[in-house]
C-alpha cells in the first residue's frame, strides 16, 4: 500500500481509502465500539457526501455548500444510522462548529426528503436517522483544539447545566492500538503513520528496523 505522495493530498488519499467498506467497518469498530465486530462490510452502504442545503432565516435564505469525506449508512440490529469520517491533518480550532453544521445539514436534508414525500404520501412520518461524525486526526502535534461547542464558549455558571452541547469525536491515529485492527490495509496505514511520526522524533527508530521498499 502506498501512502500519499507530494502529488497526492493526504485528505484525498484517505477519503478514497475508507471508501472501501471492509476498511470503514474495521476502523469504526475500533474507534466507536472498542474493537467489537458491530459492523461488517455487508451492513454498510455508501451515501451521497453532498451536504449542500439552504437555511431560511427570516425570509433570507443562506446557502451552505460542503462535502463530507466519507458518509456511510450502517445497520445495527436492523436499525439504521449514518456514520461520517472526516480526515484532518491540521488542528482546526473551529471543528466543533464544522461538524455541528455538517450534522445539522444531514438532518435538514432528511427533513426536506420527508416534506417531499409528504406531498404524495399523506401517511409519511418523520423519523430521523441518527448521525455520528468521527474525525480522524493524523497531524504531527497532539490535538490542542476544542472538542465540543462548550469548549469554545464562556458561560455563566448558572447556564452550564442547561446549555446544549455538541461533541466532536476526535480520534488521534497516533494513539490507536493498530494491533486491534483486523483489516491488514488499516493496520499498514495506521502503523505507517505512527512510525512516520516516531521517526521524525527519533532517528534511531528506523535504524533498528528493516523497512520494505514497497
Which residues make up each language-model segment?
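Elongated, amphipathic alpha-helical interaction scaffolds
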Residues: 1-214
Amino acid at each position: 500500500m502506498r501512502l500519499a505522495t507530494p502529488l497526492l493530498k493526504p485528505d484525498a488519499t484517505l477519503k478514497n481509502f475508507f471508501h472501501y467498506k471492509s476498511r470503514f467497518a474495521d476502523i469504526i469498530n475500533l474507534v466507536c465500539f472498542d474493537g467489537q465486530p458491530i459492523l461488517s462490510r455487508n451492513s454498510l452502504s455508501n451515501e451521497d457526501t453532498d451536504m449542500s442545503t439552504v437555511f431560511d432565516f427570516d425570509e433570507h435564505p443562506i446557502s451552505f455548500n460542503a462535502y463530507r469525506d466519507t458518509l456511510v449508512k450502517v445497520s445495527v440490529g436492523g436499525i439504521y444510522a449514518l456514520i461520517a469520517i472526516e480526515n484532518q491533518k491540521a488542528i482546526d480550532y473551529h471543528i466543533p462548529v464544522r461538524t455541528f453544521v455538517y450534522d445539522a445539514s444531514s438532518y435538514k436534508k432528511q427533513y426536506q426528503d420527508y416534506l417531499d414525500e409528504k406531498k404524495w404520501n399523506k401517511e409519511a412520518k418523520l423519523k430521523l436517522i441518527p448521525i455520528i461524525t468521527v474525525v480522524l486526526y493524523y497531524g504531527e502535534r497532539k490535538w490542542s483544539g476544542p472538542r465540543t461547542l462548550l469548549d469554545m464558549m464562556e458561560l455563566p455558571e448558572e447556564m452550564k447545566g442547561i446549555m446544549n452541547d455538541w461533541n466532536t469525536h476526535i480520534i488521534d491515529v497516533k494513539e490507536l492500538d493498530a494491533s486491534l485492527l483486523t483489516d491488514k490495509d488499516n493496520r499498514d496505514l495506521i502503523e505507517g503513520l505512527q512510525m512516520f511520526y516516531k521517526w521524525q522524533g527519533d532517528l534511531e527508530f528506523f535504524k533498528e528496523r528493516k523497512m520494505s521498499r514497497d
